[in-house]
Structure formats: C-alpha cells, structure tokens
C-alpha cells in the first residue's frame, strides 16, 4: 500500500517522523484527511489531535496547539506551535489550564487579556478532547 512521509515538529523537538497510510488533523475549516498523493497544500491548523495511521495499521496521536501544515504528494510536515505525544498528555494539567483561562476571562481588564484567555481556553479544551479521544481508543 502507498505511504506518505509524515514529520511532526515543534520548536522544542521532532515529535514524530515516519511513513503513514493516512493523517487526520484539525484545520481552520474543519478536519483534514491526508492520503498519499494528496494535492499540495499549505494551511493553518487548529489546536487538537493529529491522528497518524502508520504502515502497520497502528495509530499514533500527537496533540498540537496550532501551527502550519504543509502537504506535498509524498510528504506531510506539521510545524506545530507546541506538540505533545498523546501518551504524554497530562489531564490534571489541562484541567488546571482550563480553569485558569476561565478565571482570566472573568477578570480580564482589556481586549488583549480576553483574547489571550480565549486562546488558552481553546488549547486546554482541545487537550482535554484529545485525552478523551485517546481513552476511547484504548
């Protein structure tokens, strides 16, 4: 079966690099599905789970807090603002981040504070959704 090279990187490290049969991730306009031979594409991605179906049929999950996706017919590159392997996600930390963002929204003193709080809340909610999705897979 045809495969595509997938690289998921953040400023801190390379999180995943390998061949895959399929990649799904959250785009600005909804979920994107990438197969080998996909038309070239560059787009922004939203916070959420990147699902990589590897050659052997197993799945790898990586949480991204947004970033850029570049697709070429034989190569997919995810340049993530922040990327965390699915197994390394910390539910307690995500719950605390969500609570802190909600509190910041209640106590915001400017439009900038509100925008930052909304962004932090979106990332925390996406992390919690990714954790829930991983639990369903197990």
Swiss-Prot record:
Coiled coil regions, renumbered to chain: none
Gene3D superfamilies assigned: ATP synthase delta/epsilon subunit, C-terminal domain, F0F1 ATP synthase delta/epsilon subunit, N-terminal
Main location: membrane
InterPro entries in the record: ATP_F1_dsu/esu_C_sf, ATP_synth_F1_dsu/esu, ATP_synth_F1_dsu/esu_N, ATP_synth_F1_esu_C, ATPsynth_dsu/esu_N
Membrane topology: Peripheral membrane protein
One GO cellular component, as annotated: proton-transporting ATP synthase complex
Localization (cell): Cell inner membrane
Pfam families per the UniProt record, alphabetical: ATP-synt_DE, ATP-synt_DE_N
A molecular function (GO) term: proton-transporting ATP synthase activity, rotational mechanism
Family, similarity comment: Belongs to the ATPase epsilon chain family.
Entry-linked PANTHER family: ATP SYNTHASE DELTA/EPSILON CHAIN, ATP SYNTHASE EPSILON CHAIN, CHLOROPLASTIC
Function: Produces ATP from ADP in the presence of a proton gradient across the membrane.
The protein's name in its UniProt record: ATP synthase epsilon chain
């Amino acid at each position: 079966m045809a495969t595509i090279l997938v690289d998921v990187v953040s400023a801190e490290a390379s999180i995943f690099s390998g061949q895959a049969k399929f990649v799904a991730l959250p785009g600005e306009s909804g979920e994107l599905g990438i197969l080998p031979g996909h038309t070239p594409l560059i787009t922004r991605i939203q916070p959420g789970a990147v699902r990589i179906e590897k050659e052997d049929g197993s799945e790898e999950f990586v949480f991204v807090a947004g970033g850029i996706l570049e697709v070429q017919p034989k190569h997919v590159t995810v340049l993530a603002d922040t990327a965390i392997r699915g197994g390394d996600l910390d539910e307690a930390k995500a719950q605390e981040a969500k609570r802190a963002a909600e509190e910041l929204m209640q106590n915001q003193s400017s439009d900038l504070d509100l925008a930052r709080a909304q962004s932090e809340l979106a990332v925390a909610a996406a992390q919690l959704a990714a954790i829930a999705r991983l639990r369903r897979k197990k």
